Amino acid sequence: MRRFGRVLKTVLILFFLGISIPAEAQKHGKQKAIEKAADLPAVIWRDPGNISTLNLVYGAGGIEHAPDSNGTYTFDKEDMNGTSPKFDVKDGQGVKWRIKLGQEPQAETAATRLLWAAGYFVDEDYYLPEVKVQGLPKLRRGQNFVSEGGIVHRARLERKEKEIKKIGNWEWFKNPFVGTKEFSGLRMMMSLLNNWDLKKINNSIYVVDGEQRYLVSDAGATFGKTGNNISRSKSDLKGYEESKFIEKETPAEVDFEMHSRPFLLTAVDVPNYHERTKMENVTKHIPRADAKWLGQLLGQLSEEQIRDCFRAAGYTPDEVEGYSKEVQKRIAALNAL
């Protein structure tokens, strides 16, 4: 019996070592990557060039990186992070994609195109109304978006390139770009898109082509109504149209509308309440000159290009028209400052 106990103890030790050693190695590898990237230049924006020629149907990845709408994808693993259902797949060429389901796929697809057009770094996101996935188990989240034969409905596909390494997250109030017009522009884009989920975890730092790229890597909580945990929404045309864009202006600064703090009576999570209250300041005290700069950039977009952002996201013709008109109104408001 004692011998059995010793054997069992040895097995358990080996089991836990088998779990902890790879985890420690992964942690050590990530730390080395962070240290190696420390001397690389940090960038948050690049000149988009001739904005009027950009293809906003395909966005940052272009047609070259677009997923095969008729292809079959192979299930890899489910991702339980965040609030939206997500899982990873591989296509026939071995390219890895992260599929997101729920309320965010359409809004995020459109949002990344507008951010990219303004010169900001984004993930390569595409929207497909249907995706066939083989080997798909019963999902712990999002099973209601799956029909017989492994057909997944209303999916956002994010291309995962091996060459891109995530080394961390960044904060709105502490980063290398505070005080620059490019950073002011990104702050204003959050109001233009009505992105109310401005948590640090949604901002990533990628190492790409010898530089550290700072980007908003989750823009799914957009094109709805900003507000508390009861009133806010995503991908909600009526809520977006009825939202105020510019809160107030002075000769020197502009405050843009942003509501994020929880309803006071539901604020049992005090740290979350404080975090979301602070988020409302992300879009405040923007230099007027910076607002004009962003307006001039976005003003180069044609009405058709703006519509393409929403067509690419699978919205109906009426929704495409509604969202596009509201975006145009907000761009016009920037240029009228």
Enumerate the predicted regions with their spans.
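Regulatory N- and C-terminal appendages and interdomain linkers associated
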Residues: 2-5, 11-76, 91, 298-337
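Conserved ATP-binding subdomain of kinase catalytic cores across diverse folds
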Residues: 61-173
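Extracytoplasmic/secreted envelope proteins and their assembly/folding machinery
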Residues: 86, 108, 112, 186-189, ...
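Solvent-exposed, acidic/flexible segments
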Residues: 101-108, 179-185, 192, 196, ...
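Conserved kinase catalytic-core segment
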Residues: 107, 113, 165-243
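Residue-level detector of family-conserved "landmark" positions at structurally sensitive sites
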Residues: 125-126, 203, 320
